[in-house]
């Protein structure tokens, strides 16, 4: 089998690609732009351009056809329709297994990825797995992400989550589960909520960063509307900023305040602690432009 990784320039695909290389499993990567780590396997792919759909299902001579797809939805508000169109296209061309990256609070039939989840459940002859991780630790360490940039530039984390708690999870842990989902039939037609090993408020996050990085990192509590305005100041469109800010209100209400053992149950290893993640990545915040 050959595995297709969509979202090739995103956080998860690079980690999964490295695991597939180590396992010597054939794969290709689809995205609008190539990732330096996967450039030799890259195919141009755009969710909003159906002319590119067949491109990512074409394989090099000697490779088996694409039969498994890692689905990472495009970063647009109305994300379900183009993903569903691609799923239907791919399944009509022999793809038999899909693994969807969703989110911990999104149930089947809910908005956005929940609509894609529900659609996968209707396709005969196709198996699927849905991974529903909580918030990524890497949002704090990826340049261009709001939390990372404000920590680096202002020693500040802005949120509207107040005392809401989040079981932050590392992309490396998500990738290890994804590898199993892409290759292990036993995980099919299920969803898995993937959580980190501890519940942290943004005050806790700021305290850990302060301790490890050696600078005083502050958590500034905003209202939802104030956070949306702050995101717009950083160049985010108004509707997208409002959506992102509303997620913090969901956190404040306790929607993410939960723990489980899914990562260890599926991989045999405990998920990473946030303090260890910060220690391993502290140069991101130590180095300033």
UniProtKB/Swiss-Prot annotation:
Pathway: Alkaloid biosynthesis; ergot alkaloid biosynthesis. SUPFAM superfamilies: NAD(P)-binding Rossmann-fold domains. Its EC number is 1.5.1.46. It catalyses: agroclavine + NADP(+) = didehydroagroclavine + NADPH + H(+). Keywords: Alkaloid metabolism, NADP, Oxidoreductase. One of its GO terms (molecular function) is oxidoreductase activity. GO terms for biological process: indole alkaloid biosynthetic process. It holds the Pfam family NmrA. The keyword Oxidoreductase applies. Belongs to the fgaFS/easG family. PANTHER family: PRESTALK A DIFFERENTIATION PROTEIN A, PTHR43162. Agroclavine dehydrogenase; part of the gene cluster that mediates the biosynthesis of fungal ergot alkaloid ergovaline, the predominant ergopeptine product in E.festucae var. lolii. DmaW catalyzes the first step of ergot alkaloid biosynthesis by condensing dimethylallyl diphosphate (DMAP) and tryptophan to form 4-dimethylallyl-L-tryptophan. The second step is catalyzed by the methyltransferase easF that methylates 4-dimethylallyl-L-tryptophan in the presence of S-adenosyl-L-methionine, resulting in the formation of 4-dimethylallyl-L-abrine. Monomer. This is Agroclavine dehydrogenase. It comes from Claviceps fusiformis (Ergot fungus). The lineage of its organism: Eukaryota, Fungi, Dikarya, Ascomycota, Pezizomycotina. The gene is easG.
């Amino acid at each position: 089998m050959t595995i297709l990784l969509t979202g090739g320039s995103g956080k998860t695909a690079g980690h999964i690609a490295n695991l597939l290389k180590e396992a010597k499993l054939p794969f290709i990567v689809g995205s609008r732009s190539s990732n330096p780590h996967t450039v030799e396997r890259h195919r141009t792919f755009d969710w909003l351009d159906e002319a590119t759909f067949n491109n990512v299902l074409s394989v090099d001579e000697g490779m088996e056809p694409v039969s498994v797809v890692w689905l990472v939805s495009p970063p647009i508000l109305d994300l379900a329709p183009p993903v569903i169109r691609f799923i239907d296209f791919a399944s009509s061309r022999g793809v038999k297994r899909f693994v969807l990256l969703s989110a911990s609070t999104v149930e089947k039939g809910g908005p956005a990825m929940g609509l894609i989840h529900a659609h996968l459940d209707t396709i005969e002859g196709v198996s699927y797995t849905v991974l529903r991780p909580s918030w990524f630790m890497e949002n704090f360490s990826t340049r261009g992400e709001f939390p990372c940039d404000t920590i680096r530039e202002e020693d500040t984390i802005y949120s509207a989550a107040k005392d809401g708690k989040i079981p932050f999870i590392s992309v490396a842990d998500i990738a290890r589960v994804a590898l199993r989902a892409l290759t292990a039939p036993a995980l099919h037609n299920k969803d898995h909520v993937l959580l980190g090993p501890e519940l942290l408020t943004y005050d806790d996050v700021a305290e850990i960063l302060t301790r490890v990085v050696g600078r005083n990192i502050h958590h500034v509590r905003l209202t939802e509307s104030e956070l949306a305005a702050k995101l717009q100041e950083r160049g985010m469109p108004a509707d997208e900023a409002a959506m992102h800010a509303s997620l913090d209100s969901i956190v404040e209400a306790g929607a993410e305040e939960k723990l489980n053992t899914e990562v260890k149950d599926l991989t045999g290893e405990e998920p990473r602690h946030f303090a260890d993640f910060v220690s391993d990545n502290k140069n991101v915040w130590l180095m300033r432009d």
